[in-house]
Swiss-Prot record:
Belongs to the UPF0125 (RnfH) family. This is UPF0125 protein CV_3462. It comes from Chromobacterium violaceum (strain ATCC 12472 / DSM 30191 / JCM 1249 / CCUG 213 / NBRC 12614 / NCIMB 9131 / NCTC 9757 / MK). Pfam families: Ub-RnfH. It comes from the Bacteria. PANTHER family: UPF0125 PROTEIN RATB (PTHR37483:SF1). SUPFAM superfamilies: MoaD/ThiS. The lineage of its organism: Bacteria, Pseudomonadati, Pseudomonadota, Betaproteobacteria, Neisseriales. InterPro entries: Mopterin_synth/thiamin_S_b (IPR016155), RnfH (IPR005346), RnfH_sf (IPR037021).
Length: 100
């Protein structure tokens, strides 16, 4: 009997969120889960070659092996480079607000 893993894949945009429950074969990777979820097809803005993935909020490589009940998260790309935003604020003489 082949072992199976129950995992979830999560992705969120400002207008919609996905949480897809999957059953995958033992030894499946984070990338396997992302591909099997169907989210990449539903969200053309995601670049398969540059996916940023995580498991329970911690960065994970695409080839990271999954365990039972893991939640794979697909992260959106940053809209702005944090260093560049900080530099622009410094040039404008603005202080960053504490806490965000």
């Amino acid at each position: 009997m082949t072992e199976k893993l129950s995992v979830e894949v999560a992705y969120a945009r400002p207008d919609r969120q996905w949480l897809v429950a999957l059953t995958l074969p033992a030894g499946a990777t984070a990338l396997d889960a992302a591909l099997a979820s169907g989210i990449l097809e539903a969200c053309p803005e995601l670049d398969r070659t540059a996916l940023k993935l995580g498991v329970f909020g911690k960065a994970a490589k695409p080839d990271a092996a999954l365990r039972e009940h893991d939640r794979v998260e697909i992260y959106r790309p940053l809209l702005a480079d944090p260093k560049e935003v900080r530099r622009q604020r410094a040039e404008a003489g603005k202080r960053m607000k504490k806490g965000g």
